[in-house]
Amino acid sequence: MSGTKWTDEQRQAIFTKNCNLLVVAGAGAGKTAVLVQRIIEKILDKEEPIDIDKLLVVTFTNAAAAEMRERIGDAISKGLDEDPESKVLRKQLTLLNKSNIMTIHSFCLQVIKNNFHTMEIDPNFRICDETEGILMKQEAIDELFDELYEIENEDFINLVESYASRKDTRLQEVVLELHRFAKSAPFPYTWLLNMAEGFNVGENFNFEETLWADMIMEDMKVLLHGFKNMLQQSIDVILNSEGIDYYYEPFKMDLSFINSLLEKSSFKEFRGEIIAYDFPKLPLKRNKDADKEAKERVKKLRDKVKKKIVELKNILDSYENEFIKKEFIFLYPSMKALSNLVILFDKKYEAKKRERDLIDFNDIEHLCLSILTDKNSDGHIIPSDIALNYRKKFAEVLIDEYQDSNLVQEVIMSMVSRVKGYWSFYNGQLIFNEEEINLEEPQIGLDIPNRFMVGDVKQSIYRFRQAKPEIFLDKYNEYNEEEDRKNRKVKLFKNFRSREEVINGVNYLFKQIMSKTIGELDYTEEEALKVGASYGEEVKGEPIELCLMDKKYEISEEVLKEYNVDEEEALDNIQLEGRLVAKKIQKLVGNNLEGGLKVFDKKLGEYRNLQYRDIVILMRATSNWAPVFVEELAKEGIPVFADTNSGYFDTAEIKTMISLLQIIDNPLQDIPLLSVLRSPIASFTDDELIDIRMINKNITFYECMEIIYRLYKNEKLDSYYSFYIEDENKINKIIKDMNEKLKNKICSFIEKLKLWREKSIHIDIDEFIWFLYVETGYYGYAGALQAGEQRQANLRILFQRAKQYAKTSYKGLFNFINFINKLKFSSGDMGSAKILGENENVVRIMSIHKSKGLEFPVVILSGTGKNFNMTDLNKNILFHRDLGYGPDYVDTERRIAYPSLVKNIIKNKIRLETLSEEMRILYVALTRAREKLIITGLINNMDKTVEDWLNLSEDKNKVPEYAVMSGKTYLDWIGPALIKHKDAVSFREELKMTSELSNIVDDKSKWKIELWNKRELLKEKVEEDEVEISEKIKETLMNLEESNYKEEIYKRLSFKYKYDNASSIPTKLSVSDVKKQFILDEKENTEELFKKLELRKPMFMEEKKKISPSERGTIIHLFMQHLDLKKAESEEDIKEQINRLIEREFITYEQSKVISPYKILKFCRGELGKRILNSNNVNKEMPFSIEIPALEIYKELDKEIYKDEKLIIQGVIDCYFEEEDGLVLLDYKTDYVNDIEEIKNRYEIQIKYYEEALNRITGKNVKDKYLYLFSVDNYIKID
């Protein structure tokens, strides 16, 4: 039936029978087409046709299942057109509607519904909404903690004290996360108990024989391979340089030492040899003819190796068996208590679901698993009778996207497939044993393998959903390509999507950086993509572009001054990268007549001009970057749409409606009430709101309105309101003087609000929300605004959410608001309603995850200089599905806390797995492109970074694994791979990197590396803004030419106020302003002092900036304000306090990076820290205002005119504390210090006003004044 010309490998994937077949399908290999064709061939086989309902086809998404069903239906219909009388085709078309083409969850639900009688669940069960589940979980954990507190459960109390900090919400988060994590295991309770028992070591415990020791050794060997390369590179330099041959012997000894370590299989021997080794000293010979540059180079490389080996020595030296054993024994009770706590929580949560006849998403797989499995007398997990019936029913089980399977799904599929073997636990891990099992009934005819699995481990990017790529990898390594094998694999690496230029570039890059260590697979020539698509000769392909910009590129003061741009404004990195991308898109699209890129249109069968819809911008995450890019592209006139999962709850229409619901539930909330009052729903002006607030500033705003309402209506105030009225006559006068229109407006709103509150009790929440839309007219109003269609779509989503909520077990407005809040915080917001059609001519911005399975003519991958997200590694307890728990060691009695050995091992393992995931995500991103691929990124300090890249180029075939392991961004991988490519020569020359590379790679891939100039982008933007303003001014003045008022207008615009200088004197100054005034150059005249105010864009309109020096200072000051010195005995204590500020949302994780625990600890342990600890009266961040004569600051002013002029000096004193003989004033500074005297002079006037303020406020003497300088970890005394 198919007219497709299949490759030999594709034919094998379609027609191979009677085996378990793993199809390894690279990007663009046409795996879906192959899978569909295999199904068609099965159902139309002339010798052994199989009805389509006898196949189980498992897809990753519902959309994929629908597409597959549609493709099969189209193929059958096409066959019927050719042979209308075919009974087989007609039968298959009829059976298609009841075919088993579905997601794994749909199949599990089918199993549950067909076999509910075997379970203790109601046949009318409902799947609970995710947010409903979150609400139930919170109820369950609150109740559980209350019960355990009440009975004073000792294990629980110890857990709280060790891992909950001040609030038990921290421990609740640990329990909820561990519960979710455990549910990815087939048998969660067993997994939880096994992981805790891993800490239950006996007296004969020998760390050197454990899995942990082997892991440490293997991780260190990766580093040793890097050291080996460095030493080998050094030896090559020694042998090829003049006059340094005497270095050869010690370097050779070092290399032999490294080689010996790499051969060790025993941790004991490995550890012993590293600890015992002493590097031989280099000979101190002088040779006039010696190549000094080469000599210095090899010494540097050796020093680097020595330093790293010393670090490894120190680590291994701490791995003393008795110490580790004590650590395990100490942690065991806590970890056992944690496992039991999670099990108790799960039972309570399960009970709540059963009360409501609910199951959640995790239950679907686990209930199905319990139906399909049994245990035999040996305790092995084998198929149940129901599973054996499914084995009889399904002639073949086909699994799409197999690389994204988790262990629960793998066990389920093994139960319904005809596989020989059983599952059992070994060392706490569930493993499959491929052996014959004894069943009560012989399975005649069911011994022929029938499993078909298709996927690509290089595209496994769902580890965060507990996908386990190792399942695919195990079969990939075990299965054979030879025919007539029971377990066979076929590789499909011919790519039918992309141009040769894209494929060659992808192959080059991943051969360089992907390995078993990072990526979990060696990207060899065998794994490489092969060109399968033909684009003809009419249009030549273009090289892959890498566009780089230096974050640290200095813009001179002259340029900043010339363009009137603040340095921070100039260096907004995300904005500038967005601007760069906009310029690239403009160039690509051209003017749609000529000059733009031509792309091949598959539907037209010919080339056409590139359109905006052909372009996608991919990002690792879109939440912070996409809005900035949207704005930058829009400024350039480029239509753009960002597919994000954020922003919905920040839209004006949703904030207003949620505020309305909040005050209907409880009107005593000022912020939501004022939001509604200022909205078109109530239309109060700011002046009217001020008048209302004048009633009483100490009560809620609603209570003020209620008092006005009652007194205006001549209603008697009850005792509650009377309590707040000190002078009823005064209140009556305020109300009497109040505008009559305002009083009526207040009464109308109060009466409406009371009616709405009453109505909310009697109707369902979805009905009530629609009633409010109509009653207030807000839905229609939103539609009349700009982007009205989008706004109304957002309001409809809120209505749909309410409808969804109405079906849950929770009722009432209060619970709905709670539901929305949980939705907001648990799901990380939502994207706005999607009203854009697929064919809209816009550039799309989306995350790499959302692009999986899609393809685009042009792909721009942006944000490659952004750091990988490793925040999960900072938690006090880590979890790993194979290695178990990685807790901090916390001894509350001795007040000791540090990462345990097992935590460090698990932390490193998770880090490597995260890096492997990021490697695969990068692969997915680059393989979305059909014709053109552009990569953009920002770099910190271009010269230094490129030099680092050059130092990693010793191996032309591979970037060293240790370098890939230490990568923090995609550019950390891409850069070292490309810097040695032949196409990077001109780039290196541009940066004046003239040192000769011995390992330039002459690869067939084509690259174009561009260095973008921040200054030029900034200059372009400022010039564009100036032209726009200039044009508007010209247009206005042109219109004035014909006006009779021209002369008068010019006269008024030219008016100069007589006391212009006085108008420039502020009524208030901060201490910092005073400091700046006093350090002005002495030659500066008064006219310069009073230079005109420059109107600039308000800060709230500015885009998000990088952390500036001033913001850095603010963050450190904020931390010092909240620092508890009594709980700052170690760096870990300080990290804990930093994490608390992050949790309380005082600072973000990114901002926390500027706080150095080491520096804070030095302050705490220093003299000033100790003095603060000993003081009984410590005050932080004390604001003050004092009045002083203006002439004290502005000495140049006319003394007669300004003699009575006063200024208010305002400031905040960082810290002062009291000792027996007076006050001590302390101010923190984060400036970089070159000259102590300069610093003292700079801040002397500031400290003077702080001292004066303290004297006036406290009436006490300030005996000492200090500046603490964090840059040098020391203080200076101000006289």
Curated annotation (Swiss-Prot):
GO terms for molecular function: 3'-5' DNA helicase activity; 3'-5' exonuclease activity; ATP binding; ATP hydrolysis activity; double-stranded DNA binding. Keywords: ATP-binding, DNA damage, DNA repair, DNA-binding, Exonuclease, Helicase, Hydrolase, Isomerase, Nuclease, Nucleotide-binding. One of its GO terms (cellular component) is DNA helicase complex. SUPFAM superfamilies: P-loop containing nucleoside triphosphate hydrolases (SSF52540), Restriction endonuclease-like (SSF52980). GO terms for biological process: double-strand break repair via homologous recombination. Its cofactor is Mg(2+). Its EC number is 3.1.-.-, 5.6.2.4. It catalyses: Couples ATP hydrolysis with the unwinding of duplex DNA by translocating in the 3'-5' direction; ATP + H2O = ADP + phosphate + H(+). It comes from the Bacteria. ATP binds at A25, G26, A27, G28, A29, G30, K31, T32. Residues 526-853 form the UvrD-like helicase C-terminal domain. It holds the Pfam family UvrD_C. The heterodimer acts as both an ATP-dependent DNA helicase and an ATP-dependent, dual-direction single-stranded exonuclease. Recognizes the chi site generating a DNA molecule suitable for the initiation of homologous recombination. The AddA nuclease domain is required for chi fragment generation; this subunit has the helicase and 3' -> 5' nuclease activities. Belongs to the helicase family. AddA subfamily. Heterodimer of AddA and AddB/RexB. This is ATP-dependent helicase/nuclease subunit A. It comes from Clostridium botulinum (strain Langeland / NCTC 10281 / Type F).
